[in-house]
A protein has these predicted regions:
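Conserved class I S-adenosyl-L-methionine
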Residues: 1-37, 52-56
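Class I SAM-dependent methyltransferase SAM/SAH-binding core
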Residues: 44-46, 50-98
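A short acidic, Gly/Pro-enriched loop at the edge of an enzyme's catalytic core
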Residues: 101-109
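A short glycine-rich, Lys/Arg-flanked "PGG" loop and its adjoining helix->strand segment in the class I
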Residues: 125-137
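Core SAM-dependent methyltransferase catalytic element
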Residues: 214-244
Length: 244
């Protein structure tokens, strides 16, 4: 989740409105929120964007403190405006692989939606370690994102074929079930996914394995409908007795 992801500053759409037409995205976010522990007091929203997921977390846990982190200044500004009257919610500029501005063991939950596929593959170990660090013992990391079926070098025929087929099917689904604008957004971003330019799909197992390697006690993969679109929620837990 580097500065490359700030291309979202330049996407000329009403992000909340367009994503709101997509039932598959709504289902993914709902599945993520369903994983929130009822007693969570402090929540970190990674790649918080305009605050769509933040809003759902606030509804689910009205007394929790929520901190949103995003690399795109325009997104941070929009989210701050949206939550200007909420003293328990704040936003800051930052990236998943460097949460050095946040203290150790300061959150019960780290949650993310449609954001961490912006990470460069080489930064996954650092991001996983940072997520583990900021969570309290027993804390949970919830990652709702889009994934692919094939790993491999960027530009390899097998990987590119999988990504092209998957995202083309998604575009057709969006046109049929969501909106023309949602389909166009997918098509506009397709070259970035194929070049792995700020939009880099992985298999869910790739993420799970890095979380376990970082020291998470367990990590589960939850499929959401329609399963063929390969949206998944990864739920990883820090051991209750783990060092902070």
């Amino acid at each position: 989740m580097t500065s490359e992801t700030t291309h979202w500053n330049d996407v000329g759409i009403d992000y909340d409105k367009v994503l709101g037409t997509d039932a598959s995205n709504v289902a993914l976010l709902s599945a993520a929120v369903d994983q929130l522990p009822s007693g969570a007091r402090d929540i970190l929203d990674i790649g918080s964007g305009t605050g769509r997921l933040t809003s759902l977390c606030r509804t689910a846990l009205p007394e929790a403190r929520i901190v949103g982190v995003d690399p795109a200044p325009a997104m941070v500004e929009e989210a701050e405006s949206k939550f200007a009257d909420d003293p328990l919610t704040s936003f800051r500029h930052g990236v998943a692989e460097d949460l050095s501005g946040l203290p150790d063991a300061s959150f019960d939950v780290a949650i993310s939606s449609f954001a961490l596929h912006h990470l460069e593959l080489g930064t996954y170990p650092k991001a996983a370690a940072e997520l583990l660090r900021v969570l309290r013992p027993g804390g949970v990391f919830i990652n709702a994102d889009q994934f692919c079926r094939v790993m491999g070098p960027a530009g390899s025929k097998e990987r590119a074929t999988d990504v092209l087929a998957l995202l083309t099917d998604k575009a057709k689904y969006y046109l049929r079930e969501a909106s023309f604008e949602r389909m166009l957004l997918q098509i506009d971003l397709l070259p970035r996914f194929l070049r792995e330019d700020g939009e880099i799909l992985t298999t869910p197992e790739f993420w799970r394995d890095h979380l376990l390697d970082a020291g998470f006690a367990e990590a589960d993969i939850v499929a959401t409908e329609p399963v063929e679109l390969f949206n998944r929620v990864i739920v990883a837990r820090k051991a209750p007795g783990a060092a902070s």
